[in-house]
Curated annotation (Swiss-Prot):
Monomer. 1D-myo-inositol 2-(L-cysteinylamino)-2-deoxy-alpha-D-glucopyranoside binds at residues 44, 200, 240, 253, 291. The lineage of its organism: Bacteria, Bacillati, Actinomycetota, Actinomycetes, Micrococcales. It comes from Pseudarthrobacter chlorophenolicus (strain ATCC 700700 / DSM 12829 / CIP 107037 / JCM 12360 / KCTC 9906 / NCIMB 13794 / A6). It catalyses: 1D-myo-inositol 2-(L-cysteinylamino)-2-deoxy-alpha-D-glucopyranoside + acetyl-CoA = mycothiol + CoA + H(+). Coiled coil: none annotated. Residues 77-176, 173-323 form the N-acetyltransferase domain. Disulfide bonds: none annotated. Acetyl-CoA 2 binds at residues 257-259, 264-270. Belongs to the acetyltransferase family. MshD subfamily. This is Mycothiol acetyltransferase. Its EC number is 2.3.1.189.
Amino acid sequence: MTPAHPEKWPVHVVQGGVDRQLLKDCRDLLAAAEESDGNPSISEQTLVTMRAGDSADHSLLTLALYAPDEDSDPATGQDLAGFAVVVEEPDRSGVLEIAVHPSYRNQGVADRLVRALQDRRGFDGLKAWSHGNHEAAADLAARYGYAPVRELWKMRMTTAEADLPEAALPEGVSLRPFVPGQDEDAWLAVNSAAFAHHPEQGSLTRADLAARMEEDWFDPAGFLLAVDAGGRVLGFHWTKVHPRHGSHPAIGEVYVVGVAPEAQGSGLGKALTLAGIKYLQDLGLHAVMLYTDADNTPAVSLYRRLGFTRWDMDVMYGPVKEG
């Protein structure tokens, strides 16, 4: 029998990379949560970091709350009720994400994890993501003096209803797929330059790229590069296909579109966006989604003109400034 309250359940704290069993437990929980919510509870980059552990660029803290059987060893054979992950930068700023198994919601699991985190690390320099605009997350954030500081919209279009213009590439520019073992350095350079003011994307490393290329979803055919007549990479559209998950059908994603600064303003970004969407349409997917910051008015306007509508949103919370 499981004790009635999370207060009595053990919180396991791991500094650095997590072991194989805990990673499996976390993945199983995330699969159940995504089936229930239709949204991932933890970002892809955080999962990559959990596998890799600490590095010169960040440190990792994971708190796992287990619901043990009454007579079992707390270290084995229990259900993972929820977990919290903090990815911290060298300056002690960090981002918190929490996932709770659907079977253990509305029992105080997230609050137990947050209080354990408060005791272990405190909240200095910490912001938190809620993937999906959940009322429970908003209530929990307010309880600890946090309020929304950023909205990341999820926008979606139904491919059957899409009537897209042709992708008009600038003169002398052509598209080709990414070639593993050849294009990594060129892509990293363009990505870094294109997202110089967007640290989450622009700071991706060779190791980060390699980790994504090892994921089951990676397909170089859907990783489109725009090159000039001399073969120089000017931009890219990396698409992604989320496979069918339970009752949720497969869906395409405009994963990331980037254009080198010297090619910006030429219409290449729009052409790349259209080319990637067309690629996903041709796969027979029923819909295509993307993420964009709510306050990025030019991007939101472009996507709306292409037929995207707001579907859901992720909310980042930060401490309320007094005064």
